[in-house]
Amino acid sequence: MVDKGVKIKVDYIGKLESGDVFDTSIEEVAKEAGIYAPDREYEPLEFVVGEGQLIQGFEEAVLDMEVGDEKTVKIPAEKAYGNRNEMLIQKIPRDAFKEADFEPEEGMVILAEGIPATITEVTDNEVTLDFNHELAGKDLVFTIKIIEVVE
């Protein structure tokens, strides 16, 4: 039985409430969903339960499962990537991009001082950056299968 402190391997499919797959450890599922990344290794995810390596709701979901068990759980935003934080949205002068080797465009993801940010608005004078995680504020649905307890 899975408990805190136990190292396990799981296969998973992560979906938005709409049913759109945003992440998976299963290559065929990634291809079917149109999110396949050729340089990624699709294999069971290995982690120690309770060490905070994954989102809280995922770690809680695997507790008391057994090898071979599979279940689908809905994880509320507050136990996933958190609720959206308006303090993480910043307007900066468009002039700040003068030295950049690109033109800022809505929807573009950039690294601002090493932190990913999505450009949500571009005007003549300002660029709005959103530093919230792309899944912040979203309830997630995971199908999780316990593959192995690692000794």
From Swiss-Prot:
Leading EC class: isomerase
One Pfam assignment: FKBP_C
Cellular component GO terms held in the UniProt record: cytoplasm
Entry annotated with the keyword Kinase: no
Positions of region (IF): 83-132
TM segment ranges: none
Thermal dependence summary for this entry: Thermostable.
Localization per record: Cytoplasm
Keyword Isomerase appears in the UniProt entry: yes
Disulfide bonds listed in the record: none
Catalytic activity, EC: 5.2.1.8
Activity regulation, free text: Inhibited by FK506 but not by cyclosporine.
Annotated protein name in UniProt: Short-type peptidyl-prolyl cis-trans isomerase
Upper classification of the organism: Archaea, Methanobacteriati, Methanobacteriota, Methanomada group, Methanococci
